[in-house]
Amino acid sequence: MKISANSIRTGNILVYNNDLWVVSKTPEHTQPGKGGAYVQVEMKNLKTGTKRNARFSSSDYLEKAELEQKDYQFLYFEGDDLVLMDTKHFDQINIPKEMLEEKLSFLTENMIVKVEFYNDKPLNIELLPTVILEISETDPVIKGATATASYKPAILENGIKVKVPQYLEIGEKIVVKTDDMTYVERAK
């Protein structure tokens, strides 16, 4: 399926130079003073793991890989692999940990993830857009801190560091975006 260069998003898998590439960072849309607008894209080759930057004109169309998406449940780690179970047929598959990279720490037991397949080969794992995690370390609450929109560093139960509002305390649960690891809100 062809998509416009302006429609490229993080996580998209593109067919580029007869190889499969995953978009690893948010594309930068640039409108220079002279010349046409372009989109700067950082991509990672799914076969070799090499990264490259590519520049596409805003009017370019690229081939987006036709992927089959299935729901899987994360069961456990086995060496350098994740063991996942198909939620419909209960088949188990092993997928290398490096497929998730820095998002690996968001993975929790029994979490449902979407696995994308290309020609029956697993290519990509998508986590839920947000997860609920507990604050394990942060500075003490400062009285009257709710009046300002300042943030303080916090370490979550999975070891990830995020900036949270001043009024949050250790032990509170918060919602965190998995794509950019930022605080969303206090968990309800």
Swiss-Prot record:
One of its GO terms (biological process) is peptide biosynthetic process. The keyword Cytoplasm applies. Transmembrane segments: none annotated. Pathway: Protein biosynthesis; polypeptide chain elongation. GO terms for molecular function: translation elongation factor activity. Belongs to the elongation factor P family. This is Elongation factor P.
